[in-house]
Amino acid sequence: MWRERAARCGEAIAEQFCILRGYEILARNAREGRGELDLVALDRDTVVFVEVKFRAGPNRAGQARGGNDRGGPLAAVTGKKRDDVARAATRWLAARGATGRPVRFDVIGITWCSEESELRVQHVPNAFPGGSRHFF
């Protein structure tokens, strides 16, 4: 339950981050087949699929609870996750007749450092090219 709440909180922070940068939010937590897209946004004429990763830890190194360092939020976007997001994005675009639109995949990593009472947001635009097998 804590994990779900933290994920939703991270997604809300990422959404506000995107809005402040001029993105128009098109969808939140969009389910496409078995996949889910955290955020779908429009940055000028480009459809942006944003994968959000949230981590909470005691220190600046991004260590998780219990001192377990999992590499921070961006390290959680594995090759399989990239493929899953790309597959869901393909379905999302096809369902809306938008397969010819420019597309980008961003990752927003959010880390809460409790010892420092600091929230860090890291945005990686064009973080991956659409997965290893699924591109438009």
Put a short name on every predicted segment:
Residues M1-R28:
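Acidic-basic catalytic patches of nuclease active cores, encompassing PD-(D/E)XK
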Residues C18, L37-G62, V77, V85:
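Conserved catalytic cores of phosphodiester-cleaving nucleases, focusing on short active-site segments
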Residues I25-A27, F49, F105:
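Hydrophobic residues on conserved beta-strands that form the core of alpha/beta folds
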Residues E32-G35:
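Short acidic/glycine-enriched loop/turn segments that link adjacent beta-strands
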Residues D69-V103:
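Mid-chain, well-packed structural core segment of small domains
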Residues A94-F136:
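Domain-level recognition of nuclease-like catalytic cores that cleave nucleotide substrates
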